[in-house]
């Protein structure tokens, strides 16, 4: 494909130019041009101006010392290892578009790159300028970009040509998606960049999907005693939709992917790591036992009244020690049956009590005891 400069559609180009004149150059508003530019772009422009930057400033990409490259590689070994197979796959999807993949850490420092477009033309030179491990592509270094805005907003973005703050970076078009680690913290972002290329906003979807794949690999690599694969009943699970939870020997959630956080409506972060008991109305010992059987898929009630399908597995890579012995205690089984009856009765305790042939007071007492205690295997 030719690397000739391709402008965005006329309407969008005019809106971008008008927004730049109004916000960056202080021109009085004569239209609603700025309303056609995404709010997160305007916020980034404002941050650049507050930092004393001017659009016409020259942006240079200095050589990176070998020692700095080694330090970056060492610090991000786990991220790069998880991302590289994903980058190889997505690079096949964009091979004919003159776009390429860039992986950064949470500070916008390049930690890995995909294959670059062939050539010795100006576009290839621009690509090589940024596609080097150790290059700083943060907002403080290069202004508004998909990298800086994805990290600042922690949302996937698409950015084309004149939406970059600096004139020197207006040759780039890029899609970006943030990356979140198993504990829920932002650990970097995945960027798909083209130079003087056709506008491809659909790459935002590819970047987002690929970022979720990288996150899933990181969760699968997280040391744990038990790993839970979650899906909704009747909905086939897949890499893009399956929830993943890492559980330690004490029943604490030690890692999760984005799908699990959404399905369980929980942050599942290091600062808010719930017990398995807080999520599932089922004894943890039963999940460990199902993992030992190896092929069990359970339909598990949540405290919200919803149900999820859970496929428990023994802890994977890096898990210390063997899976502890786990046998459900009688009181745990009893409590689980009561929870199930309440869930089946859609929260109607009186109806659940009638079904079980026990008093409502007994139902309340058993539920409270099960909720307050922490179930551990063994």
What is the role of each PLM region?
Residues 256, 272, 351-354:
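Extended hydrophobic-aromatic, low-complexity segments
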Residues 328-378:
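Bacterial C-terminal helix-turn-helix
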Residues 162-163, 171-176, 278-325:
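PAS-family sensory/regulatory modules and their coupling/dimerization elements
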Residues 1-141, 145-161, 171, 180-250, ...:
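Intrinsically disordered, low-complexity terminal regulatory regions
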Residues 133-135, 270-282:
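PAS-family sensory/regulatory domains
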